[in-house]
């Protein structure tokens, strides 16, 4: 979910009287500035010359601060992803997880940010992997994971094997596609997985082989469409929503999912929000037409004419 570089200082233009002599051979009377002692003129130039240098120095300081913030943000995101994987691995043994373990093995010198890191990790665990992070012993800061995520529809539970984490992964991919204008390059999907701490081609204890899950299950079940991008050499491929996702999952649901991960309201993304509202209206009209058709057929079978 870009900062513009700060403008750099420009040299201060010379005053009219400081420019080289007249125009077209015209002789001008000495100005007040020309009559000043050389020492004064030199001092004035030094003061004027220092101003753009200070401006450049300030711009460099601002750029350095912005770079430091970006690095800190990237490190925080990386720590959250590593903590999520650590908690999932620890949960395989069904043993409680202590705060001291998290700090020792993952968080390290960022322990002052523990409340924010654990809160963000809990959001990812819930909405992506289907687990609720619960603190059951406040005195000793001990946590456990509980499988809590409910699929959107009962039919989806059957199609996805009743697997909350797989549904969470699908929602992440659908969200990426939607936020990028309804298509996402294959490389962008794999990069998103890596940011979650999931290697596409390596075995993951929740997803199996993620790349195989996406290409063989999600694509074949028509949750995702996969096609070559025209006019690309070497060839590139992209994902989009498949027909099954368009039927079973609304854009507003996916936008709400993304908003929860970022702790924002869906209106934070006005373009996607307007598109989701239009999609909701289309679905409501289609549902009304289908219900009217069903009532008409039922009335016809019963021999009742409504009009």
UniProtKB/Swiss-Prot annotation:
According to the entry, every stretch annotated as the MAGE domain falls at 76-277
The answer, when asked if Transport is one of the entry's keywords, is no
The segments labelled Disordered in the record are 1-55
Q: Name one GO biological process term.
A: protein ubiquitination
Any signal peptide, and if so, which residues? Answer: none
Keywords, ordered alphabetically: Tumor antigen, Ubl conjugation pathway
Regarding tissue, the record states: Ubiquitous.
Residue ranges annotated as compositionally biased, kind Basic and acidic residues, are 16-27, 35-48
A GO cellular component term found in this entry reads: nucleus
Pfam families, sorted: MAGE
Keyword hit for Coiled coil: no
* Stored PROSITE patterns: MAGE
Quaternary context:
Interacts (via MAGE domain) with RING-type zinc finger-containing E3 ubiquitin-protein ligases LNX1, TRIM27 and NSMCE1; the interaction is direct.
- Function per UniProt: Enhances ubiquitin ligase activity of RING-type zinc finger-containing E3 ubiquitin ligases. Proposed to act through recruitment and/or stabilization of the E2 ubiquitin-conjugating enzyme at the E3:substrate complex. MAGEF1-NSMCE1 ubiquitin ligase complex promotes proteasomal degradation of MMS19, a key component of the cytosolic iron-sulfur protein assembly (CIA) machinery. Down-regulation of MMS19 impairs the activity of several DNA repair and metabolism enzymes such as ERCC2/XPD, FANCJ, RTEL1 and POLD1 that require iron-sulfur clusters as cofactors.
Checking PANTHER family in the record gives:
MELANOMA-ASSOCIATED ANTIGEN F1, MELANOMA-ASSOCIATED ANTIGEN MAGE ANTIGEN
Name the chain's protein. Melanoma-associated antigen F1
UniProt source species: Homo sapiens (Human)
Lineage, broadest ranks? Eukaryota, Metazoa, Chordata, Craniata, Vertebrata
User: What gene makes this protein?
Assistant: MAGEF1
